UniProtKB/Swiss-Prot annotation:
Record family assignment: Belongs to the class-I aminoacyl-tRNA synthetase family.
Location in the cell: Cytoplasm
Stored InterPro entries: aa-tRNA-synth_I_CS (IPR001412), aa-tRNA-synth_Ia (IPR002300), Leu-tRNA-ligase (IPR002302), Leu_tRNA-synth_edit (IPR025709), M/V/L/I-tRNA-synth_anticd-bd (IPR013155), Methionyl/Leucyl_tRNA_Synth (IPR015413), Rossmann-like_a/b/a_fold (IPR014729), tRNAsynth_Ia_anticodon-bd (IPR009080)
Keyword annotations from UniProtKB, A to Z: Aminoacyl-tRNA synthetase, ATP-binding, Cytoplasm, Ligase, Nucleotide-binding, Protein biosynthesis
A GO molecular-function descriptor: aminoacyl-tRNA deacylase activity
Species, as recorded: Pseudomonas paraeruginosa (strain DSM 24068 / PA7)
Catalyzed reaction equations: tRNA(Leu) + L-leucine + ATP = L-leucyl-tRNA(Leu) + AMP + diphosphate
Motif 'HIGH' region: positions: 42-52
Any Pfam family matching the protein: Anticodon_1
Protein known as: Leucine--tRNA ligase
Residues annotated for ATP binding in this entry: 635
Region of interest (Disordered), ranges: 624-643
Lineage: Bacteria, Pseudomonadati, Pseudomonadota, Gammaproteobacteria, Pseudomonadales
Length: 873
């Protein structure tokens, strides 16, 4: 055993052992309890960042801990390999996205290996490979035939120069991110998953996920957005519109119907189209609306604009004529593309009515307090629907609470055939068509005679050609007759293959299930294997995936269940959302007002007595730089630390130890070079103590029955550490406090005597405990130390240590003694001492006698096992 800790040598040795012995290969073992631990798989962007390292280390610690508990542990890894960044990189470097992606995968896989992750690589999935996406295509065809997937026109951002559809985030200030062209809204045919058919179940079954953070469940509940309301029909005013008909709106506030003063429709609504025929100003406004963003978030923040039409509808209860406006905040794909406006009691309508001088009618008043309704100043209570308000100015519906008004107005609308109660969801069907190249081809053939025909199972997969370099102008597949020319599977006539590809969220919605049977060729899943491993016992990933990915994965799991592929209802039993990795930022302001960001490694900092950074200068020129505070590591702020350079300098175990010690996993982790140094120093201490112990020769067995009091204290420290770490790692995932417990134990072991055989046997137990408790966190050093401590089996196959309760029993206790709440001394008493004995010992303490001299002792408070407080005056 080397005297010095040499991480590179140690880590190579451990990793070679795991490879040779296939230590992480797992099979289904029906008689053994399974544990499936999964970290969200990475996008192969080129190299790992610290966020990846943290995510995968957390998963690895949990996996290794459960293996030490005797469970059959699966920890797989794969690559979320389709997507826009590959196309962008391909255009930039003039290389096919496939080649770029596979190169990145090879490099990142070597990085993951260097971290020492206990991954079963035989189960690796790569989502851009046909053997993976073929089953996605198969499920698509099944769901299309069942009507769970359908085709309809959808509104998209169209770049007229690049002739392509842009994602919302690619539209910057109304222009295309690449071409700079003004973006148009266009209607194009797209495929949709009918996720709304599962909205109720997706909402209800959140209650069956006690192992999920409440915050994530709340975000999903809000996204699904169940609301009870009414669909209300406003009859057309035939004099202005020219024909009979109804304008339908959904509202959660039918109780305020008597306050409706106008209606607003989306730019794409048929009434808007009709009104614009002889109104060039309105047509120009509609065109402007169509150019705007299609994202809900954009619409929420943009300025509310509208234009009146010459059309009217009738109020369903009073018959009053209400003007029809076209407004940019009404979305065609929400409800029927129309809203009833009650400016007195809806903040958005209130702003709009004040802007355009529309009437504002109060129909709700406060029950108590001042009824201070002002039509020019919005107040929070205007929108209330609780017991604090009642209806007013509503004729026969006056003086009713929200529910009573809802029911009374609803009943009258239903009687007139102009309303019906309805539950609506904010959730929209999931449009998955992408006019992109680097994605999974949609398995549909368009035939003039037969319509949209799913590709038959025996003709799957529809393979994406991999030798294409996109140019950014439209989809390359649409320009490749060799891809799209085909014959119809039904009638045999010439037909055209679909050239859109699927949203990349589809691949990440079922990968967790394919890991159970990645080589299975008989179907999407081998049900027996899938039911053995699923659901995932512990899923780990960032909170930013709380809605889309986690909702789509839950939806897909239910689709697979309904196809008979899996037996469970939910994919992930427990969810851990890890915090971000943050680091200091430094910059200089440029002449044009921009910022040049400098990497922390290139900056020298000056700290105050509390180690706070108070000054910074660039190493290269010695000139000051501004301190920007701590932010998430990112390329844009140039504050990332390359994991590879850290591993090369200190070893993977140091990086892993720092990551787990610096912060609880669900909190942000602040990068600190001093913290990394500290972690490395601690591992060197462990190595040094073990080296000294092993060099003196391994001891015989410990005789627990004949320990001295001092030895009992050492053994107690060992088992206190086991108890603490078992709770922290096993129950709470507080790896930082588990490591702190091991550090406390190390302090005891370093000071413990090693003269006689019992001392050395006790040190052996202490070092073995340190190694076992650290094994999930720093597996390489523990692999070597376990072997050096005389064990034939590898630590990867060792069991987690068990607390010996008898070691925690104390013969004597040391108690704190206070006089009037101030510390005045300590006393040693027998663990079995009575309250009277404890009080007598405290009163006899010489310091107590000194501080109570001339005073009367009023009472003595004894907190068993902790302290005695003597109150005297």
């Amino acid at each position: 055993m080397h005297e010095q800790y040499q991480p590179l040598e140690i880590e190579t040795q451990a990793q070679n052992y795991w490879k040779e012995h296939q230590s992480f290969l797992v099979r289904e073992l029906p008689d053994k309890e399974k544990f499936y631990c999964l970290s969200m798989f990475p996008y192969p962007s080129g190299k790992l960042h610290m966020g990846h390292v943290r995510n995968y280390t957390i998963g690895d610690v949990i996996s290794r801990y459960h293996r030490m508990q005797g469970r059959n542990v699966l920890q797989p890894m794969g690559w979320d390999a389709f997507g826009m960044p590959a196309e962008n990189a391909a255009m930039k470097n003039n290389v096919a996205p496939a080649a770029w992606t596979y190169d990145n995968i090879a490099y990142m896989k070597s990085q993951l290996d260097s971290l020492g992750l206990a991954i079963d690589w035989t189960r690796e999935v790569t989502t851009c490979k046909p053997d993976y996406y073929r089953w996605e295509q198969w499920l698509f065809t099944r769901l299309f035939e069942k009507g769970v997937i359908y085709r309809k026109n959808g509104t998209v951002n169209w770049d007229p120069v690049d002739q392509t559809v842009l994602a919302n985030e690619q539209v910057i200030d109304g222009r295309g991110w690449r071409s700079g062209a003004l973006i148009e809204k266009r209607e194009i045919p797209m495929y949709y998953f009918k996720i709304t058919a599962y909205a109720e179940e997706l909402l209800e079954s959140l209650d069956n996920l006690p192992g999920w953070p409440e915050q994530v469940k709340t975000m999903q509940r809000n996204w699904i957005g169940k609301s009870r309301g009414m669909e209300i029909a406003f009859p057309y005013d035939q004099a202005s519109i020219g024909h009979a008909g109804q304008l339908k709106v959904f509202t959660t506030r039918p109780d305020t119907l008597m306050g409706a003063t106008y209606v607003a429709v989306a730019a794409e609504h048929p009434l808007a189209t009709q009104a614009a025929q002889n109104d060039p100003q309105l047509q120009a406004f509609i065109d402007e609306c169509k150019r705007g963003g299609v994202a809900e978030a954009d619409i929420a923040t943009q300025e509310k604009k509208g234009l009146a039409t010459s059309l009217f509808v009738e109020h369903p209860l009073t018959g009053d004529k209400l003007p029809v406006w076209v407004a940019n905040y009404v979305l065609m794909n929400y409800g029927e593309g129309a809203v009833m406006a009650v400016p007195g009691h809806d903040e958005r309508d209130f702003e709009f009515a004040n802007k355009y001088g529309l009437p504002i009618r109060q129909v709700i008043a406060r029950v108590e307090g001042e009824n201070d309704f002002e039509p020019t100043v919005w107040k929070e209570w205007y929108g209330a629907k609780d017991e604090s308000v009642r209806t007013v100015n509503s004729g026969k519906y006056d003086d009713l609470g929200y529910q009573a008004a809802f029911d009374a107005i609803g009943a009258d609308l239903e009687a007139k055939g102009l309303g019906q109660a309805r539950t609506q969801f904010r959730l929209r069907d999931w449009g998955i068509s992408r006019q992109r190249y680097w994605g999974c081809p949609i398995p549909i053939i368009h035939c003039d005679a037969c319509g949209d025909v799913p590709v038959p199972a025996e003709q799957l997969p529809v393979v994406l050609p991999e030798d294409v370099v996109p140019d950014g102008a439209g989809s390359p597949l649409a320009k490749m007759p060799e891809f799209y020319e085909c014959s119809c599977p039904k009638c045999g006539q010439p037909a055209k293959r679909e050239t859109d590809t699927m949203d990349t969220f589809v691949e990440s919605s079922w990968y967790f299930a394919r890991y159970a049977c990645p080589q299975f060729e008989g179907g999407m899943l081998d049900k027996k294997a899938a039911d053995y491993w699923l659901p995932v016992d512990q899923y780990i990933g960032g909170i930013e995936h709380a809605i889309l990915h986690l909702l789509y994965a839950r939806f897909f799991h239910k689709l697979m269940r309904d196809e008979g592929l899996v037996g469970s209802d939910e994919p992930f039993r427990n969810l851990l959302t890890q915090g971000m990795v943050v680091a200091d930022t430094y910059y200089r302001t440029t002449a044009n007002g921009g910022k040049d960001w400098f990497n922390p490694a290139d900056v020298e900092v000056e700290r105050d007595a509390k180690a706070k950074v108070v000054g910074a200068r660039l190493k290269s020129d010695g000139q000051p730089v501004e301190i920007g505070g701590t932010e998430k590591m990112s390329k844009s702020k140039n504050n990332g630390v390359d994991p590879q350079s850290m591993i090369d300098q200190y070893g993977a175990d140091t990086c892993r130890l720092f990551m787990m010690f610096a912060s609880p996993p669900d909190m942000s982790l602040e990068w600190s070079d001093a913290g990394v140094e500290g972690a490395n120093r601690f591992l060197r201490r462990v190595w040094r103590l073990a080296h000294a112990h092993v060099s003196a020769g391994l001891p015989g067995a410990l005789d627990g029955a004949s320990l001295s009091d001092a030895q009992k204290q050492v053994r107690r420290a060992i088992h206190l550490a086991i108890r603490q770490a078992s709770q922290d790692v096993g129950q709470h995932h507080k790896f930082n406090t588990a490591i702190a417990a091991v550090m406390t134990l190390m302090n005891v072991l370093e000071k413990a005597p090693s003269q006689d055989a019992q001392d050395r046997a006790l040190l052996q137990e202490g070092l073995e405990t340190v190694v076992l408790l650290l094994a999930p966190i720093t597996p390489h050093i523990c692999h070597v130390l376990w072997e050096q401590l005389g064990h034939a089996e590898a630590v990867i196959d060792a069991r987690w240590p068990v607390v010996d309760e008898s070691a925690l029993v104390q013969d004597t206790l040391q108690l704190v003694v206070q006089v009037n709440g101030k510390l005045r001394g300590h006393i040693d008493v027998a663990a079995s001492a009575s309250r009277e004995d404890v009080e007598a010992a405290a009163r006899a303490n010489e310091n107590v006698l000194r501080f109570t001299e001339g005073l009367s002792i009023r009472k003595v408070i004894v907190v068993p096992g902790k302290l005695v407080n003597i109150v005297a005056n």
